């Protein structure tokens, strides 16, 4: 694929409205998303605490990932590290009819990489994105369909958040502090508030949050029990319950 040009892939089941972009992320209480599934999954930066989600898995985990994540996908967008991690596992997965395997192996995929050739990136229908990622993802979102889903893909997820391109954030939060590793949000993240669409707590202690971004606001909690909120330079007073 030529740099700066997106080859649009048609999926037969797509709806007519433009696709939404969602981030679907496993995250710890301290915001780490690196190497959740295994010690050697992602050791970049000297990360030694991979596999941190495994002790906390429960029966609801699989249902959430299947029914509330992948069931909404019409296309998948991945960074290089996540692509390289997923491809050997899911391409050889024993039951290719399971939902996650079917989506990852047969649905349109977009890979962000300036180094892999199209031949090296061969995994079902995969298009390599090179050059201006933000503008090319913006163009992909104009295709009809349900969701263009990002899974993992730390650097890509941060880039899309900071560009304001993410429509839905699905965060599966695990009750563990990892203490080191790549974080979804850091001191350079675009300030953003969120509307909670839904939240689910599982028996094993997982919390599934579905969030939509809204405008960041700040305020001043005053001594007289009111708070002054400021949004776009406009002050709004509200009473704080005692």
For each of these PLM feature ranges, what is it?
Residues 3-18:
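Short, Lys/Arg-enriched N-terminal segments with co-localized hydrophobic residues
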Residues 19-163, 176-242:
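Portal/gating segments that form or line small-molecule/metal binding sites
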Residues 165-174:
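Short hydrophobic/aromatic-enriched beta-strand-loop microsegments
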